[in-house]
Regions:
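Secondary-structure transition motif
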Residues: 1-135
Length: 135
């Protein structure tokens, strides 16, 4: 069975938290929370809605969990952003090349986790998404 896990940046201090996604309406406002177990209590913290990302179900070569909007570097030097693809027929994750449209990832980059490592995410490292900056 696959893990359903989300990550988001806390509103109060900007730290990343992982857990279950809780979406609540308060007097017309929609607020997002990440819930997690602390000792024996369920704790929830409010997160910035735009930063909520879903775990794609694999880890990189360093056993770090890969979430949508993470920026990964492949064994072959390609810099890619992990994206969630949603259509009427299916939902899945994919990677898009950031450096050049001609350097799109191939199937070896995506399906062999030892070929990937997380170098950041699009929220903490927006320059990597907007430019051809290399790591």
């Amino acid at each position: 069975m696959r893990d359903i896990l989300f990550r988001g940046k806390r509103i109060d201090n900007g730290n990343w938290v992982e857990g279950c996604l809780i979406k609540r309406k308060y007097y017309g406002d929609v607020r997002y929370y990440i819930g997690f177990i602390e000792v024996t209590l369920l704790t929830k913290v409010e997160v910035i809605p735009e930063t909520v990302c879903q775990y794609v179900g694999i880890t990189d070569k360093n056993s770090k969990k890969i979430f949508e909007n993470d920026i990964v570097k492949t064994k072959y030097g390609r810099l890619c952003q992990v994206v969630w693809v949603s259509s009427p027929y299916y939902q899945c994750w994919d990677m898009i090349g950031l450096e050049s449209k001609h350097q799109a990832p191939d199937w070896r980059d995506i399906w062999y986790k030892d070929n990937l490592y997380v170098v950041g995410n699009s929220y903490d490292n927006p320059r990597l998404v907007e430019s051809d900056e290399t790591i």
